[in-house]
């Protein structure tokens, strides 16, 4: 039984990275590994976020790593050092975690998630308003391309390990992608 929970936890971690999930079958705005999501569909902001916070200004991030220099902008390749926090600032995932809940993910790029009853697949429907920096819509094929890149030959083995339980990704239509699990 402990192994089952451990495996479910790691699959959930993949989900928050935009990769995978395990649960009963229904489409919902969020997925909770334990219990029900705290926030309802369409919630405006997390409770710990101040929507009236001042906007604008300058953000300075200081890396706590020994090295603060970089020689590449692709954080996924093996060779070189990427700037600190680059992945967090440039890339979005299908789901985003909540800081006031344990193991719960809410749709970020995904409008909803539907998990198969057998736990062997999860389908994500992308938000129509999900866009790249140039205004082009994020499509299911883009999500599949991201997965294929992360498990490809030029990517750090850490991503292949993280995604080892994912058998593959299928594009169901322009806005729907399905992750299949081993």
Predicted segment positions?
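Bacterial N-terminal signal peptides that target proteins for export
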Residues: 2-14
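Short basic (Lys/Arg) and small-residue
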Residues: 130
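N-terminal lobe/hinge region of extracytoplasmic solute-binding protein
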Residues: 27-118, 148, 155
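N-terminal cofactor/phosphate-binding cores enriched in small/glycine residues
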Residues: 88, 118, 122-124, 143
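Cleavable N-terminal signal peptides
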Residues: 15-16, 25
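Surface-exposed binding/hinge segments that line
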Residues: 125, 160-182
